[in-house]
Amino acid sequence: MSSKDASFVIVDGASGEAYLDPKQVTREEFQRRQRDDQEKSNRAAALLEKPAVTADSTSISMLVNIAGLDDLKNLDPSLCDGIGLVRTEFLFGEGPDLPNEDTQYDVYRQMIEWAQGRPVTIRTLDAGGDKPIKGLTIDGESNPFLGVRGVRLSLARPEIFRVQLRALLRAAVHGPLKVMVPMVTVPAELDAVRMLMGNAYHDLKREGFTVAVPALGM
């Protein structure tokens, strides 16, 4: 029998199997499974609004990791304790041109405002390895996963890194922001980032922006 000839079809989403005109016992089994799945979903939904606490009453902070604004569309900020990681690579791969300062600032601002005062950690660009970006990462690098990527790529392209740092500093006035720097291997790399961020901060002050220095974390 083909699916066109069947008057009733059950599709098992777990196994990918389809049952054409199944017997009554099969229908009842799938109805039972459907009820069980709905009950599990209801129990999980009820737990979302409760604080995360271990069996010995230890509170645990639950923060979400996101890779773009779309991840926040259907998420209530009150159900988590903030954003634990924002991967900014999506901004650099959406079009033919690299994102300018205002574009980045607007995205970071929306994320921070969504959190409603809860902490937000944004990671600077971690391009390279399995995340190449045309015109930015190095083609044909012998060791792309551990070579010029993360902070090393940012420091090698300070004109691009400076734009991201300025956007982050401007967005920091909208809520508690932390900046994560990826792939740091030696203290000198972090010192260089601090220097560039300090320069960007002072440039913004001279231009008249109100900024707050975000915490810098690894």
Language model: regions and residue ranges:
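Conformationally flexible catalytic loops at phosphate/diphosphate-handling active centers
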Residues: 1-8
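Beta-strand/loop-dominated core regions that host nucleotide or nucleotide-derived cofactor-binding catalytic loops
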Residues: 15, 22, 29-31
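Conserved alpha/beta-domain cores
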Residues: 39-218
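Feature 9007 captures long, charged alpha-helical oligomerization segments
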Residues: 33-37
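Surface loops and adjacent helix of pleckstrin homology
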Residues: 21-23, 125
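Generic detector of well-ordered alpha-helical segments enriched in charged/polar residues
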Residues: 27-32, 152
